[in-house]
């Protein structure tokens, strides 16, 4: 039942510090609205200790597709709807930056970046469960050992997706997949949703840059620093 899965997700969000207890009712109502429900689950929700929200999200995504909230046959729409769900359980950009700066000032930069990385995992922006399915091996070459990885978080496009992309009118927003206007973007068939995406401002040589983690993790704690202006 969708309402029960919503309660499971709220429990996960609370235990992982995504949603404060004071914000739980607001988050619950936002999720109920997203799924077209008028009331929450009335029973007790069993206590769980989940590392990742994948199982809950899969159940909610299956239910959302059945309700016609998105085309379940198109993987990109499924991934985009997942970001929409988790975006309702995240602190806003300003709150993320405030927490990051507070941790950096009180406990140092490692504590701040560790918190930010965990936030990206807990919100499934970094798709850790899928990354664990990556196929990886080493092979010897004349230049030394080469590590090869087949990244399972970026599946090949299916024929329906390719056909829909051809019908999609060109859009110049966001300018690229790294620009800061990606924060909270709903996505489209040829552009990933970023409602569960946050960035941290950093100053380098007196200029404004931003720090983010890569959702695909080509190497451990793969991060990206980009300029405030698209260049």
State each model region's role.
Residues 1-230:
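Active-site microenvironments that recognize anionic phosphate/pyrophosphate groups
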């Amino acid at each position: 039942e969708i309402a029960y899965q919503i309660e499971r997700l709220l429990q996960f969000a609370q235990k992982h510090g995504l949603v404060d207890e004071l914000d739980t009712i607001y988050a619950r109502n936002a999720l109920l609205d997203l799924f077209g429900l008028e009331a929450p689950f009335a029973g007790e929700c069993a206590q769980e200790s989940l590392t990742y929200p994948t199982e809950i999200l899969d159940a909610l995504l299956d239910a959302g597709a059945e309700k016609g909230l998105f085309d379940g046959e198109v993987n990109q729409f499924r991934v985009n709807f997942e970001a929409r769900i988790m975006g309702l359980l995240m602190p806003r950009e300003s709150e993320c930056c405030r927490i990051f700066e507070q941790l950096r000032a009180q406990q140092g930069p490692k504590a701040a970046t560790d918190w930010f990385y965990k936030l990206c995992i807990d919100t499934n922006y970094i798709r850790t469960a899928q990354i664990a399915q990556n196929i990886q091996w080493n092979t010897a070459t004349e230049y030394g050992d080469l590590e090869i990885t087949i990244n399972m978080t970026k599946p090949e496009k299916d024929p329906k997706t390719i056909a829909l992309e051809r019908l999609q009118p060109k859009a110049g927003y966001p300018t690229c997949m790294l620009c800061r206007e990606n924060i909270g973007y709903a996505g489209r068939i040829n552009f990933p949703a970023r409602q569960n995406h946050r960035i941290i401002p950093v100053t380098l040589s007196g200029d404004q840059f931003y720090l983010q983690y890569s959702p695909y993790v080509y190497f451990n704690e793969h991060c990206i620093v980009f300029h405030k202006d698209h260049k």
